[in-house]
Amino acid sequence: MDTALRRIDELTAEIQPLRGQLINFARRQRGCQALQRHYGIGWLCAVIIWAEIGDARRFSSSYQLVRFAGLDITVYSSDSKRSPGHLSHQGSPELRWAAFEAAKSAARRSSPDCGYYHKLAAKHDGHNGKNPTLAVERKILRRCYHTLRELGDAALALPDPRPQQVAA
């Protein structure tokens, strides 16, 4: 037990400087700043989404980003039968995690997506009725796509080199 607690303390000591660097990066990089303006996206989700999407202009539409994240539904079809499958789960699991974390905040009353989330949750037909969080995840990724695409080159620019103080 003491060994495990010591290891946790060692890892915490290693994590704290990295946490500070990521927070500084998120505060100074324009793409991350823009992503953090969306409800539910904090500094960690912003950095992950920014890093995983990269240049949003490489996607011709927001749907391609949703497919890239693996949040699209596969379809099985044979002859005249066509049945919806499951999530493709192709792409980055980190991007899916960040989108999920941001989407879970949509159930809160202060969220701009609260009405959308609860409307889907009340609906019992179709896939969205089963998982309104998935629909909100897609919606958030589409917003992120448009935000980064509008920024253009500024979304990818290196952050301001002046470091800011971060409260631990």
Feature roles, as predicted:
Residues M1-A168:
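A detector of single, family-specific signature residues
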